[in-house]
Amino acid sequence: MFRGASAINLDTKGRIAIPVRYREPLQLEHQGRIVITVDIQSACLLLYPIHEWELIEAKLLKLSDTDKTQRSLKRMLLGYAHEVELDGNGRILLPPPLRQYANLDKRIMLVGQLNKFELWDEQAWLQQIDECQETIRSEELANNERLADFSL
């Protein structure tokens, strides 16, 4: 399970180093294979260990190619999807179209989301956190049925 936020750097070749604490589980459970695609709701990337991505692909396979919305979702997620592999130094290469989509430059945030990671431009991440705090403070949280009995 992936949790926590890590500040990392994008090198001049477009690579990032996955933090050491995640490398062993990625290597042992997923042979170091990761699929990167776009988040369709935010300007960030999603990094799925290969076995998690295969579950997403199975869901996408069930979507209709004749329904415009479903086809659009498939095009975005699959069209941007790139499979990468951790190198010997725990790095992965982020393809240019993905870097452009998420406006990734030098400073990046890798954010664990249990079964996947989000990859954000550092400034966009800080702005997103502010927006999340606003949402949590608003009545939207109190009025959300699925969160009615959620307790920490």
Swiss-Prot record:
This protein's GO CC annotations: cytoplasm; nucleoid
Location, primary (coarse class): cytoplasm
Keyword vocabulary terms for this entry: Cytoplasm, DNA-binding, Repeat, Transcription, Transcription regulation
Superkingdom in the source lineage: Bacteria
PROSITE patterns named in the record: SPOVT_ABRB
Signal peptide region: none
BP-aspect Gene Ontology terms: negative regulation of DNA-templated transcription initiation
InterPro entries per the UniProt record, alphabetical: MraZ, MraZ_C, MraZ_dom, MraZ_N, MraZ_sf, SpoVT-AbrB_dom, SpoVT-AbrB_sf
MF terms (GO), sorted A to Z: DNA-binding transcription factor activity; transcription cis-regulatory region binding
Cellular location(s): Cytoplasm, Nucleoid
Start and end residues of each SpoVT-AbrB domain: 5-52, 81-124
Subunit text: Forms oligomers.
Family (UniProt): Belongs to the MraZ family.
Name of the protein: Transcriptional regulator MraZ
Source species: Shewanella sp. (strain ANA-3)
Gene: mraZ
